[in-house]
Regions:
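Catalytic pocket-lining loop regions of alpha/beta-barrel enzymes
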Residues: 234-306, 324
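Mid-to-C-terminal alpha-helical segments outside catalytic/metal-binding sites
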Residues: 338-376
Length: 376
């Protein structure tokens, strides 16, 4: 377990070393850069990449990929694709970039090396405020990520895999929390408390009245607002993580007051958050650069119609100028990210969304959030 809990600053070194090793392997196995297909995905990376105009210039702000951890200690899903093979598929589909998402490590270092390997693509990284950065939200980890060479670490996710809300609400997270309880008390990372000092979720499923953010969360938000990344001089981005609607709204309110430039409301319709349309509308209405994220899980061929309807309603509640579509895939047996986004484009068209609206959610808004030039 100690190996799994290796320091936040050490694991990324392994990741970037693996990236160079993977680059060598990719070169040795030819232009396709694949070895038969994704593990258990049911189709091969060598299959043609999706050809959809909505993907030309698209940026995925939430792309899971290897190298990442998988094992009995943390329980997150194995990954179906590594950063190099994902780049090749995304590039073939005409995509412009993606953010390398991991719950447990910062990915600024991996983004730096991927940019050196493939300078024709926009790679960005981020970090999750989970136990690998400490038992509390850790402002120092944010500074560390921002000062990694290149400055390509941009998104700071509040607690996700280790959040207090998810550990109470979602069954597989509760199992995960039971593992963590062997090492940490409490076995989750909190973002809020009652004004009286008690636990925000002492009476789950109801939060306490008059809750407030923890001091370290407020400090982290201030850092996100005021810190520029090394070399590239970019702004940091707050993503709300897998926290409750009440906690998300508190964080967004505090972030707007602190001057955070861009805010992502992390997948508000997944079980790990579970917002209402009214709460989504309230969240994005707090400022001009707040964006609700809608992941591709509503776009699969076996998704129930009522789920699609729920997502369409959520997107309309946010408004396309305050919404982004992300894949959030990369798990074993899930669609590859470009394929998932192409599915979403089809579902959205079927439900009355125009090409301009698709461009807003897949190209224009992600570029705004990352502070890069708008698509031509």
């Amino acid at each position: 377990m100690n190996i799994c809990r290796a320091q936040h600053t050490i694991l990324p070194i392994v990741a970037v070393a693996m990236a160079f090793g993977l680059a060598t392997i990719a070169a040795q196995r030819g232009g396709a850069g694949q070895a038969g297909g994704a593990r258990g995905s049911g189709y091969s990376l060598s299959d043609p990449a999706p050809n959809d105009p909505a993907l030309k210039g698209a940026i995925d702000l939430h792309a899971h990929q290897d190298p990442d951890s998988n094992g009995p200690s943390y329980g997150q899903a194995a990954r179906s694709v590594d950063a190099i093979d994902l780049y090749k598929r995304a590039k073939a589909a005409g995509m412009r970039g993606f953010v390398i998402k991991e719950h447990l490590d910062q990915t600024a270092g991996l983004a730096y090396y991927m940019r050196k390997l493939y300078p024709d693509f926009e790679f960005f990284g981020g970090m999750g405020s989970n136990f690998t950065t400490g038992p509390k939200v850790n402002p120092w980890a944010i500074i560390h990520m921002a000062e990694i060479k290149g400055g390509w670490g941009r998104i700071v996710w509040m607690p996700s895999w280790d959040s207090e809300w998810s550990s109470h609400k979602v069954a597989n997270y509760a199992t995960h929390a039971a593992q963590l309880s062997k090492f940490f008390t409490p076995p989750f990372v909190s973002v809020a408390k009652c004004n009286s000092g008690g636990a925000f979720w002492a009476n789950f499923p109801k939060p306490c009245a008059n809750g407030e953010l923890l001091p370290e969360v407020k400090d982290a938000i201030k850092l996100i607002a005021t810190t520029k990344t090394r070399d590239s001089n970019g702004d940091l981005i707050l993503a709300t993580g897998h926290n409750s609607p009440e906690e998300d709204l508190m964080m967004i309110k505090d972030a707007v007051a602190a001057g955070v430039k861009h805010i992502i409301l992390t997948h508000p319709l997944l079980d790990s958050v579970d917002m209402t349309d009214a709460q989504i509308k309230e969240a994005v209405g707090m400022g001009p650069e707040i964006y609700a994220e809608f992941t591709s899980f509503f776009c699969g061929p076996t998704v129930r119609p009522e789920v699609v309807t729920r997502y369409i309603g959520g997107i309309r509640a946010a408004g396309v100028d305050h919404a982004v579509i992300t894949s959030d895939t990369g798990q074993l047996n899930s669609l590859f990210q470009p394929d998932a986004l192409a599915n979403c484009a089809k579902v959205l068209r079927t439900n009355g969304f125009t090409e301009r609206e698709l461009d807003a959610m897949l190209k224009i808004n992600p570029a705004k959030i990352l502070g890069i030039a708008q698509p031509q």
